[in-house]
Swiss-Prot record:
Protein name, per record: Cell shape-determining protein MreC
Highest classification ranks of the organism: Bacteria, Pseudomonadati, Pseudomonadota, Gammaproteobacteria, Pasteurellales
The species this protein was found in: Haemophilus influenzae (strain ATCC 51907 / DSM 11121 / KW20 / Rd)
One example of a Gene Ontology biological process annotation: regulation of cell shape
Keywords, comma-separated and alphabetical: Cell shape
PANTHER family assigned: CELL SHAPE-DETERMINING PROTEIN MREC
Family, as annotated: Belongs to the MreC family.
Positions of region (Disordered): 318-351
InterPro entries: Cell/Rod_1, Cell/Rod_MreC_2, MreC, MreC_beta-barrel_core
Function: Involved in formation and maintenance of cell shape.
GO cellular component, one term: plasma membrane
Length: 351
């Protein structure tokens, strides 16, 4: 069967035809504006194809950028979280240091006498069971600590040193069952002996006749009897008084002012002259005035309004319960009753 179309022209002829056609179009484009309009229309028509052909690349680039941004944001978020944790830890440490600094400042201001040498000690260990109430501090013989030395904190009397090592010392707390301390009621100077019960929040007053004027809320301070311990440092507050007509002695319980179960820093006291018997005594009126100033100072530290009338022991207890940081209350040393002369022990019982 004979083909419809004849044989195609040779390649050379087709090339010449294309060349002449191109030259003709170039000449026509420069002289005829209709060719320009036709070319513009064609470019407009195929412009959408350019966008369509480029869309996969745009989509892939967008996905890649989103993945990079997400990964970058996750890394930045992790870094920021870590920085936030570090800043929070620094803030907590700063708050702790502020509280600690406040406690140390109150501790250093607690002695009643300006002629007393004082030194801060840190509590290393504590034994506060019913049979033993003792702590170990980081001050020893090389630091000048000695057996019988008074130990206080910013709120009240802690106890006394009973043994001294080269670098550490053991302190007997005033709530230990083997410990007793001579005290007096700040309100009326009634003198009694306060003994430990084995509980960190309780003292017992020994041999108190039921006729003695002592009431719940009375503030007990060191009496200084025996010439060994200085007077005027707060020790405890009377919590309960039970009188029975069938018993000659009243049952009196008191609560130590110092928080013995939460001790961290304590203060060791030295008189300017180690011969305490030669230290000038403070009169009861001076003791009351000094302690009154301490109570008012404590109220001011806790941002409480100071009353126009003198603060009472009840006011002190209320402020103590509301204050977060321990108030600026002076404290002094403790003494076992058996350390005193027999005559003075009998004198206390009679009082």
């Amino acid at each position: 069967m004979k083909p419809i179309f004849g044989k195609a022209p040779p390649l050379g002829i087709r090339l010449l035809i294309a060349i002449f056609a191109s030259i003709a179009l170039i000449l026509a484009d420069g002289r005829n504006s209709s060719i320009t309009k036709a070319r513009s229309a064609m470019e407009t028509a195929i412009g959408g194809l350019y966008y369509l052909a480029n869309s996969p690349r745009s989509i892939l680039d967008g996905i890649s950028e989103n993945l990079v941004d997400t990964n970058k944001l996750q890394i930045e978020n992790k870094v920021l979280r870590q920085q936030l944790l570090e800043k929070n830890a620094d803030l907590l440490l700063l708050d702790q240091l502020k509280v600690e600094n406040q406690r140390l400042r109150l501790l250093l201001n607690s002695p009643l006498r300006t002629d007393e040498y004082k030194k801060i000690a840190e509590v290393l260990t504590a034994e506060t069971d019913i049979y033993r109430q003792q702590i170990v501090i980081n001050q020893g013989k090389k630091d000048g600590a000695y057996v019988g030395q008074p130990v206080i904190d910013e709120k009240g009397v802690i106890g006394q040193i009973i043994s001294v090592g080269e670098n550490t010392s053991r302190v007997l707390l005033l709530t230990d069952v083997t410990h007793s301390i001579p005290v007096q009621v700040l309100r009326n100077d009634v003198r009694v002996i306060a003994s430990g019960t084995g509980h960190t929040d309780e003292l017992s007053l020994d041999n108190v006749p039921r006729s003695v004027d002592i009431e719940k809320g009375d503030l007990l301070v060191t009496s200084g009897l025996g010439g060994r311990f200085l007077e005027g440092y707060p020790v405890a507050v009377v919590q309960s008084v039970s009188r029975d007509s069938s018993n000659y002695f009243a049952i009196v319980k008191a609560k130590p002012l110092a928080l013995l179960e939460r001790l961290r820093y304590v203060l060791l006291l030295w008189p300017s002259n180690l011969d305490i018997s030669k230290v000038k005594s403070i009169s009861p009126e001076e003791v009351r005035n000094l302690v009154q100033k301490r109570l008012e100072s404590q109220a001011n530290e806790a941002n409480y309004r100071v009353k126009k009338t003198p603060l009472t022991e009840k006011d002190f207890l209320e402020n103590e319960e509301k204050t977060i940081i321990e108030p600026d209350i002076p404290t002094d040393f403790l003494q076992n009753e058996e350390d005193l002369p027999i005559e003075q022990q009998e004198e206390r019982i009679e009082d």
